[in-house]
A protein has these predicted regions:
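Acidic-and-aromatic substrate-binding clefts and catalytic sites of carbohydrate-active enzymes
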Residues: 24-30, 53-61, 128-133, 160-163, ...
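Active-site groove signature of glycoside hydrolases
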Residues: 112-133
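Alpha-helix N-cap and loop-to-helix initiation/capping positions
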Residues: 28-32, 60, 64, 95-103, ...
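N-terminal small/glycine-rich loop or linker at the start of catalytic domains
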Residues: 7-25, 83-96, 119, 124
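Hydrophobic faces of well-ordered beta-strands that scaffold small-molecule active sites
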Residues: 14-18, 48-50, 80-84, 123-125, ...
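Beta/alpha (TIM)-barrel catalytic core signal, keyed to glycine-rich beta->alpha loops juxtaposed to Asp/Glu
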Residues: 134-326
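N-terminal binding-site loop/beta-alpha segment at the start of enzyme catalytic domains
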Residues: 1-80, 146
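Short, acidic/polar
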Residues: 28-40, 99-114, 164-167
Length: 334
């Protein structure tokens, strides 16, 4: 495994981190989930990314992770970097969602209990909810660190203006933002570019704002939820997220333009000696501002395939040009 420092900090993360968004909930096979977490740790993936609403059912990924940790990895807690987040819908009533102090304080206590932990290594505000003042949310994160419930704090998916404000507040309190999470893939470059291809605004680039403020960047959905693999080349498989009526990927996302682009990218990957998925991961990691990339896997074999992306992280100028000619199109973006 290769490791990289988070922004202007002394914390290192593996280039590939394991996300528990899918495949670790109560509807999934517990033994398979356990095998994947233990295999990841054995392979040097020491960073595990959770959120209180991960499952399904919400909270069940935390519960399963806590059980696996308790049964197998308790002695290795100090070798692990465990992340958690709160801010999306979690429990009934007006306090079960959003970025308020009320929600974050209740959420971290619940999450620590489900995960059987005394503290998280990092705790994120999972989103800017559009209503709660950033000052309120950041003060909650600051207090969470001062209470010993998390060592570091982070933000996820914050728009550029709120992102900078969050950094300023945290810095003034001497609790700097360790990590900023954004979605990024060959088909989703808004955070990287500051807008859609051909209409980007570098001043709104979440990546550059993070880099300017010393925050590490961690990317999620690097495979565009399977679109940057061969999964959808010949239609929609019955076991795919789209077929399961995912709230995050729809049949309308599988456009002819994206399928053709994925096939063209697949040819470049083949010439590089990689699978499409491996090249897509390598491409995200090729941005020097990126600390780590979160992968979501459904099997040990799939995880091992993703890990092989680290065998070839370099792109020639010719490869970069060919790739950019394929992906620098607004119609490919989400």
């Amino acid at each position: 495994m290769l490791y990289k420092y988070c922004g202007h900090s002394g914390v290192q993360l593996p280039l590939l981190s394991l996300g528990l968004w899918h495949n670790f909930g109560s509807v999934d096979n517990f033994d398979t989930a356990s095998q994947m977490i233990l295999h990841a740790f054995d392979k040097g993936i020491c960073h595990f990314d959770l959120a209180n609403n991960y499952g399904p059912e919400p909270g069940s990924a935390e519960t399963n992770f806590g059980r696996i940790l308790h049964n197998n990895l308790t002695a290795h807690r100090d070798e692990m970097f465990i992340a958690n987040k709160a801010g999306h819908d979690m429990w009934p009533g007006v306090y079960g969602t959003g970025s308020s102090r009320k929600n974050l304080m209740a959420s971290i206590d619940q999450s620590l209990k489900r995960c059987r932990l005394e503290y998280f290594d990092i705790f994120y505000s999972h989103r800017y909810d559009g209503v709660t003042p950033v000052e309120e949310t950041m003060q909650a994160l600051i207090d969470i660190v001062r209470q010993g419930k998390a060592l570091y704090v982070g933000i996820s998916k914050y728009p550029a203006d709120k992102q900078q404000l969050a950094y300023d507040i945290l810095r003034e309190a001497h609790v700097p933002c360790l990590l900023s999470q954004y979605r990024c893939s060959m088909f989703d470059r808004k955070a990287q570019l500051g807008g859609l291809p051909t209409n980007e605004d570098p001043t709104k680039s979440n990546f550059q704002i993070a880099a300017n403020n010393g925050s590490g960047i961690i990317c999620f959905s690097p495979l565009a939820q399977g679109l940057l693999t061969v999964k959808y080349d010949n239609g929609i498989p019955a076991d795919s997220r789209i077929a399961k009526a995912s709230a995050f990927l729809h049949t309308t996302d599988v456009t002819p333009e994206r399928i053709e682009a994925a096939k063209a990218l697949g040819q470049i990957a083949k010439e590089r000696g990689q699978s499409m998925a491996q090249m897509a991961l390598a491409w995200v990691l090729s941005d020097e501002r990126v600390t780590s990339c979160i992968i979501g896997t459904s099997s040990v074999a799939q995880m091992d395939n993703n890990l092989q992306a680290l065998d070839n992280l370099q792109f020639t100028d010719e490869e970069k040009q060919k790739i950019n000619e394929i992906i620098y199109k607004p119609e490919l973006s989400f």
